[in-house]
């Protein structure tokens, strides 16, 4: 989905807005205005579907991936989506069921093992880097992670070791 209308864009360009919302991305736009107003989401069809749709989130307390879904509650489903999209530092953590979560890519960038364990024999993985690319290991940025997430040492560990 490409949004060309400036008033419906989800990237915060105004420094004041970034500071106030503590986010580079307007997550309220994406998870409140888009599904209810701008690009209406058919929750009834989604909830009635027999297909499973797990979203990967990273538990900030444990630093581990969790695979969540909701088939009844719109707000909880959108909270799971928001958490799954909340890039550390760029977006705030999201609380679900009393736990804080961020983007699932921190703990499980490509959840192929989960997919295989849940019975999916065929998987499509779309690479967004050149063939052979490997993320460099290192602790670059760890000071920022420690400062931002000092209450969550397991999340810091997951962020620093993400390339492994």
What do the predicted segments below correspond to?
Residues 41-49, 81-86:
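Short linear motifs in intrinsically disordered
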Residues 53-58, 92:
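Short beta-strand scaffold segments in enzyme catalytic cores
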Residues 3-41, 48-50, 58-74, 105-164:
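Non-catalytic peripheral regions of patatin-like phospholipases
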Residues 45, 88-92, 124-125:
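Short, structured loop/turn "capping" segments at alpha-beta junctions
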Residues 49-53, 96:
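Short, proline-enriched alpha-helix->beta-strand connector loops that line the catalytic pocket
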Residues 1, 27-29, 87, 93:
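Detector for methionine-enriched segments
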């Amino acid at each position: 989905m490409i949004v060309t209308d400036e008033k419906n864009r989800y990237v915060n360009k105004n420094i004041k807005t970034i500071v106030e919302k503590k986010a580079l991305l307007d997550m309220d736009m994406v998870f409140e205005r888009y599904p209810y107003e701008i690009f209406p989401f058919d929750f009834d069809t989604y909830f009635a579907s027999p297909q499973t749709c797990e979203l990967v989130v990273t538990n900030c307390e444990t630093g581990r991936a969790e695979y969540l879904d909701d088939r009844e509650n719109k707000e909880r489903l959108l909270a799971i989506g928001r958490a799954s999209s909340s890039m550390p530092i760029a977006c705030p953590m999201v609380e679900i069921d009393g736990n804080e979560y961020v983007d699932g890519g921190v703990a499980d960038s490509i959840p192929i093992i989960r997919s295989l364990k849940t019975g999916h024999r065929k998987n499509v993985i779309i690479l967004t880097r050149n063939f052979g690319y490997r993320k460099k290991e290192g602790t670059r940025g760890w000071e920022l992670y420690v400062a931002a997430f000092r209450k969550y040492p397991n999340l810091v560990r997951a962020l620093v070791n993400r390339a492994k």
